[in-house]
């Protein structure tokens, strides 16, 4: 699904990747690990079309990633769980989850029902959809971000330190959810230092 061939990436005089080649296949969970500053987040941002890269060295579904329009990629192909959650902090949970349902023709009742169901899936049934994001703990906000991606249901999910704000038990619950998505032929790539994710991933890739 994603083929990285001889990728080179530099920031000024600092080379992050030199001749990096990797293959990612749908229906699998990949864990990216390595020391801080090794390029995990940079690689995710490149795959998300946020960070530019040199040469035409990445293909997605057989097409050069650079040739895919960014708007289409963000709207239809990608779910990105940012390290800082990527949520609208001053908006309600419902407003944030609405972003995962863009493009779906749903009544207000259907939308609310789906959002309440996904909160149950991520262990947040006790929260109200009217609560503001800034009122939540870090772990709760992280799970709301995951709920938004689940609603969007994209073929590619990227996650940066997905479980950083979660305890080990909740980390396993979140991974169980991702493994369910994996069975639906989703490709999931997670940058993480968490051994819980290493254990459950199909492949662990260590960047130097």
Go through each PLM region and give its residues.
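Conserved ABC transporter NBD signature motif
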Residues: 56-66
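ABC ATPase NBD coupling module
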Residues: 65-79, 183
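Conserved ABC ATPase signature
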Residues: 132-136, 140
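Catalytic Walker B motif of ABC-type/P-loop ATPase nucleotide-binding domains
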Residues: 157-160
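Helix-to-loop junction immediately C-terminal to a conserved catalytic motif
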Residues: 48
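Conserved ABC ATPase "signature" region
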Residues: 109-127
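Conserved structural motif at the start of ABC-family nucleotide-binding domains
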Residues: 2, 17-19
């Amino acid at each position: 699904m994603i083929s990285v061939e001889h990728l080179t990436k530099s920031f000024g005089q600092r080379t992050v990747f030199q001749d990096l080649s990797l293959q990612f296949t749908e229906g699998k969970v990949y864990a990216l690990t390595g020391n801080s500053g090794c390029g995990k987040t940079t690689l995710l941002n490149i795959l998300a079309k946020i960070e530019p890269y040199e040469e035409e060295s990445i293909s997605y579904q057989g097409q050069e990633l650079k040739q895919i329009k960014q708007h289409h990629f963000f709207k239809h192909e990608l779910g990105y769980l940012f390290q800082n959650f990527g949520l609208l902090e001053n908006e309600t949970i419902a407003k944030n989850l609405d972003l995962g349902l863009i493009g779906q023709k749903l009544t207000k009742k259907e939308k609310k029902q789906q959002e309440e169901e996904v909160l149950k899936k991520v262990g947040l049934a006790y929260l109200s959809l009217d609560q503001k994001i800034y009122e939540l703990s870090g772990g709760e906000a992280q799970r709301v971000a995951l709920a938004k991606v689940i609603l969007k249901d994209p073929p590619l999910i990227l996650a940066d330190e997905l479980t950083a704000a979660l305890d080990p038990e909740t980390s396993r619950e979140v991974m169980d959810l991702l493994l369910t998505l994996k069975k639906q032929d989703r490709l999931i790539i997670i940058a993480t230092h968490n051994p819980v994710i290493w254990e459950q991933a199909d492949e662990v890739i260590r960047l130097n």
